[in-house]
Design a protein with these regions (language model features):
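Active-site glycine-rich loops that stabilize anionic/oxyanionic intermediates
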Residues: 35, 39-43, 118-119, 251-252
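Catalytic active-site module of serine/aspartate enzymes centered on a nucleophile-bearing elbow/loop
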Residues: 272, 276-311
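Short beta-strand/loop motif that positions the catalytic acidic residue
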Residues: 247-249
C-alpha cells in the first residue's frame, strides 16, 4: 500500500524554535485512525520510517515531529539537546499537543493513539495526565519506573547550569543518567549496545549525527523533571481512568530496570484506579523495541492492541 508524506512546521510553545513534523498518509484506502509518534532522547521522527510504513499499510495515518533540540527542530547545532531557558519539559508536552491538534484538524473524527518511546514515553505520560481525554489510547515503549534520585539529578543539573551555563555539556551528568546502561552488555562494542540487540541498528545510531550527541545540562534537568513527574502519583491520578494504556518493554532494557521498573510504573497506574492498563515484556529484547530483531512481532502486537481497543 502506498502513502503520501506531508511535511509541516509550527512555532514551538517555547517561542524560540520552529518545529518540523511529518504525516504519513495512506492512499486509496479507508482511514482507520491516527498514530502519533513521540520520539526519544537523541532521536528524530525519520528514525520511525519502517514503523510508519507498517502502520500506513494497515490504514493508519502516522504523524510526529522532531522535538525541540532534535533533528530539524533546532536553530543551530549548539541547541542540540537544549529545550528552553526554563521549564523546557513543559514545552515538550505542549508541542506534542500541538501536533495532535494539527493532525486532527486535517483529519477530524478519527481515533488518535499516542506512541511514546523512552523520553517520548515520559512526555506521553505527562501528556495523558493533562490531555488524556483527547486520545483513544497510548502505547508506552521503553519507559521508566519511579526514580528517587531524579530530584537529586535536577539539583545537580541546576548547580552545573549556574556555574557553567545552561548550554554546558557534562559527561558527569551523562554518566549519572546513562553510564549504567551498558553494564549488562560488557564487553561492549559501542556505548550504545544497550539500545538494541541488532548490531546493524546500533551502528546506524552511532554513525548518525542526529542521534550521537550529548544533552546540555539544561536538557538533562528537563529530562529528570519528566522522569519525576511521569511517576508522580499526583500526576497519575489525573489520567482518565478508562484510557487504554499499553506498556511494552524489553526484559533487558536498562531504562526499565530489566522490566522491574516498568512493572512498578504499571502498579502505580493500577493503584490509581486506571482500569485498562496492559503490559507486555519481550524476552531478551533491549531498549528500542521497534528496531529489535523481532520488530515485526512488536509491530503486530501494537496493531492488534490498537484495533482491539478501537472496537
Amino acid at each position: 500500500m502506498s502513502f503520501e508524506i506531508e511535511e509541516f512546521t509550527f512555532e514551538s510553545s517555547n517561542k524560540l524554535n520552529k518545529i518540523y513534523g511529518k504525516m504519513y498518509i495512506p492512499v486509496d484506502v479507508k482511514l482507520k485512525g491516527i498514530v502519533q509518534i513521540c520520539h526519544g532522547m537523541c532521536e528524530y521522527i525519520d528514525k520511525y520510517i519502517n514503523f510508519a510504513k507498517f502502520l500506513t499499510s494497515n490504514g493508519y495515518i502516522v504523524c510526529g515531529h522532531d522535538q525541540i533540540g532534535h533533528g530539524m527542530s533546532i536553530n543551530s547545532d549548539d541547541n542540540l539537546g537544549y529545550f528552553a531557558p526554563d521549564n523546557g519539559y513543559k514545552y515538550l508536552i505542549e508541542d506534542a499537543k500541538k501536533v495532535t491538534d494539527i493532525v486532527t484538524e486535517k483529519f477530524p473524527n478519527l481515533p488518535v493513539f499516542l506512541f511514546g518511546h523512552s523520553m517520548g514515553s515520559f512526555i506521553s505520560r505527562c501528556y495523558i495526565a493533562k490531555y488524556g481525554e483527547t486520545l483513544s489510547g497510548v502505547i508506552l515503549c521503553g519507559t521508566i519506573g519511579p526514580q528517587p534520585l531524579a530530584r537529586a539529578g535536577i539539583k545537580l543539573a541546576n548547580l552545573m547550569s549556574e556555574r557553567k551555563g545552561s548550554h554546558y555539556r557534562s559527561k558527569q551528568l551523562y554518566n549519572i543518567a546513562l553510564d549504567f546502561a551498558n553494564l549488562k552488555f560488557l564487553p561492549a562494542t559501542t556505548r550504545f549496545d544497550w539500545i538494541c540487540s541488532d548490531k546493524d541498528e546500533v551502528l546506524k545510531h552511532v554513525a548518525d549525527k542526529k542521534c550521537n550527541f550529548l544533552f546540555t545540562v539544561s536538557g538533562f534537568k528537563d529530562l529528570f523533571n519528566l522522569v519525576s513527574l511521569c511517576n508522580s502519583p499526583k500526576v497519575i491520578k489525573t489520567i482518565p481512568k478508562d484510557l487504554p494504556i499499553f506498556f511494552i518493554s524489553g526484559s533487558l532494557d536498562p531504562i526499565g530496570e530489566n522490566s522491574l521498573g516498568v512493572k512498578r510504573a504499571v502498579k502505580l497506574y493500577k493503584d490509581a484506579g486506571l482500569s485498562k492498563v496492559k503490559c507486555k515484556i519481550y524476552p531478551e529484547d533491549r531498549h528500542e523495541l521497534i528496531n529489535e530483531k523481532n520488530k515485526k512481532e512488536v509491530y503486530e502486537d501494537i496493531l492488534q492492541w490498537i484495533e482491539k481497543v478501537s472496537k
